[in-house]
C-alpha cells in the first residue's frame, strides 16, 4: 500500500504542550479507527510551524478525508516513491 507525506501548516506547532499533542493524537486515532484498517498513521515530525506526517493509505483521497473529518490542515500530500538512507550509498 502507498505511503504519503502530509505537510500540515500549523503556526506555533513547535510550542504545543504535551497535553495538546496528546489530544490531537487521540482525535486522529479515533478517526482512523472509524475509517478502518486501510489507512494508518505511521508517525509525525513537529517543527516550529508545521507538522509532517507519514501515513499508509490506499490513495491521497483517504488522507484528505481523514484531515477533513479531524479538522486538520493537509496543505500538501505527496506520495512517497522510495526511501533512502546512508546505507543507500554503499
Task: Locate predicted features.
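A short linear hydrophobic-aromatic micro-motif
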Residues: 37-43, 76
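Short S/T/G/P-rich N-terminal loop/turn motif that feeds into the first structured element of a domain
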Residues: 1-33, 40, 50, 85-90
Amino acid at each position: 500500500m502507498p505511503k504519503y507525506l502530509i505537510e500540515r501548516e500549523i503556526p506555533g506547532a513547535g510550542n504545543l504542550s504535551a497535553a495538546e499533542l496528546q489530544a490531537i493524537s487521540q482525535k486522529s486515532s479515533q478517526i482512523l479507527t472509524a475509517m478502518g484498517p486501510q489507512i494508518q498513521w505511521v508517525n509525525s515530525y513537529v517543527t516550529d510551524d508545521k507538522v509532517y506526517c507519514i501515513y499508509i493509505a490506499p490513495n491521497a483521497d483517504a488522507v484528505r478525508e481523514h484531515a477533513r473529518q479531524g479538522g486538520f490542515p493537509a496543505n500538501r500530500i505527496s506520495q512517497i516513491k522510495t526511501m533512502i538512507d546512508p546505507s543507500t550509498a554503499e
